[in-house]
């Protein structure tokens, strides 16, 4: 069987203060963890192993339990989380049989993620808002942590991370001693992973929003009031790049959410900025973000489909159009309908771009590949009767790393086009 590589071997890490007792309390667990056997030969390196490949254990561990995994012939595979209720039965974490997955393991892995951002990427020089942990990209399948100044927002995508959340909190406190915490899990994830969890704040109340700065532009990050973790730091470099193309131009920000692209554009000297979103709550936050930066933006609550048709019929056109819709689907069987919706909205968006203008279009649907998205855009240009010159293709910032063997982690597609005619 081929060697399995879920993480690099490491030297023992020094325990953060407060974790020593947790390690002693849980030392026996990793000595006596249940063993899960695969039913077929397995030569993969992806950290997910699906239910159909796993023998059902006689005594099923609780969802999110740490287990040892062996092949059909008893050969060691690795150590990870087991969930007999989820489509993803195993989330592999550790390939070294000599390394326990315990509080010290989490402290080391989270510490490495923080050091990547601070010492290699040097993100503190750019912003006080960045992704601390990006799930599989940082070897922590099912965990996302975002930093917004003094507020850490923790999102659980697996029962295993939820079950071991105290280890996670302790490790984060070591790296960010003065941080506030807000943690939650999407209802769909809870149902899929078989656990129940209500949002929790370390202060015991709804957390106060954090004021963040990136590339000199200020925003309010509000995990309790906005979508996902409260702000989309993944678009930081895309916002910055596009903002240098907008001086003196009319800008339309579709699906504007809390105003990220639009606020950048206004700060960088756009002559006019219009933001459209169907969600009044996020528009209220967007107006606050414009006020934070002392810029004027016209925000409109509307469904972009009829709004764009009306704008095109009225001959309204913009120099720069941004289209950044929410995730379309979690289901592989719904990818084709999702692509059809992307096609329809991009075709309409192209109808309000001036000749020679720019279209910045995005997809955060991980199941839609970059190739599929570019093909959709080609067809949108054809049906709209517009010729597209692609200037730049990118994705999320470097604080959202992905493993080459886990393409699902590379979820964001960003395409910047010039509309030639």
Positions of predicted regions on the chain:
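Conserved SAM-binding motif I beta-strand of class I
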Residues: 272-277
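Conserved class I S-adenosyl-L-methionine
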Residues: 248-255
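C-terminal catalytic and target-recognition region of SAM-dependent MTase-like enzymes
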Residues: 344, 358-421
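Conserved SAM-binding loop of SAM-dependent methyltransferases across substrates and taxa
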Residues: 258-271
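Non-catalytic substrate-recognition/targeting regions of SAM-dependent transferases
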Residues: 133-146, 162-232, 240
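Non-catalytic accessory regions of SAM-dependent methyltransferases
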Residues: 6-8, 16, 22-149
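Mobile active-site "lid"/loop adjacent to the S-adenosyl-L-methionine
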Residues: 282, 318-348
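S-adenosyl-L-methionine
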Residues: 281-319
């Amino acid at each position: 069987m081929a060697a399995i590589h879920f993480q690099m071997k490491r030297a023992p890490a020094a325990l953060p203060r407060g974790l020593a007792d947790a390690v002693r309390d849980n030392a026996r667990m990793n000595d006596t963890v249940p063993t899960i056997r695969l039913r077929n030969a397995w030569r993969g390196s992806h950290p997910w192993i699906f239910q159909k490949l796993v023998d059902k254990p006689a005594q099923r561990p609780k969802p999110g339990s740490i287990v040892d995994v062996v092949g059909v012939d008893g050969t060691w595979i690795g150590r990870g989380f087991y969930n007999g209720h989820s489509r993803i039965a195993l989330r592999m974490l550790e390939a070294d049989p000599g390394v326990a997955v315990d509080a010290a393991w989490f402290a080391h892995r989270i510490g490495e993620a923080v050091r990547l951002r601070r010492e290699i990427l040097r993100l503190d020089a750019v912003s006080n808002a960045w992704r601390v942990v990006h799930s599989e990209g940082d070897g922590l399948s099912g965990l996302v942590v975002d930093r917004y100044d003094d507020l850490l927002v923790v999102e659980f995508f697996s029962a295993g991370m939820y079950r071991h959340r105290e280890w996670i909190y302790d490790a984060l406190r070591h790296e960010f001693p003065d941080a506030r915490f807000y943690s939650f899990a999407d209802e769909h994830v809870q149902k899929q992973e078989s656990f129940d969890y209500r949002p929790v704040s370390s202060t015991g109340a709804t957390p106060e929003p954090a004021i963040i700065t990136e590339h000199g532009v200020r925003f309010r990050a509000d995990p309790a009031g906005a979508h996902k973790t409260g702000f989309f730091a993944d678009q930081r470099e895309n916002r910055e790049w596009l903002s240098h193309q907008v001086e003196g131009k009319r800008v339309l920000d579709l699906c504007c959410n809390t105003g990220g692209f639009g606020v950048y554009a206004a700060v960088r000297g756009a002559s006019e900025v219009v933001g459209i979103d169907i969600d009044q709550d996020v528009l209220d936050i967007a107006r606050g973000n414009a006020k934070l930066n002392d810029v004027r933006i016209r925000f409109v609550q509307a469904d972009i489909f009829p709004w764009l048709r009306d704008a095109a019929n009225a001959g309204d056109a913009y120099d720069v159009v941004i289209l950044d819709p929410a995730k379309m689907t979690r289901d592989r069987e719904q990818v084709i309908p999702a692509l059809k919706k992307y096609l329809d909205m991009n075709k309409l968006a192209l109808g309000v771009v001036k000749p020679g203008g720019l279209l910045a279009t995005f997809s955060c649907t991980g199941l839609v590949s970059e190739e599929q998205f570019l093909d959709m855009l080609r067809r949108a240009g054809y049906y709209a009767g517009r010729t597209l010159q692609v200037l730049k293709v990118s994705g999320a910032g470097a604080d959202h790393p992905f493993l080459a063997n886990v393409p699902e982690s590379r979820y964001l597609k960003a395409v910047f086009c010039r509309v030639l005619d």
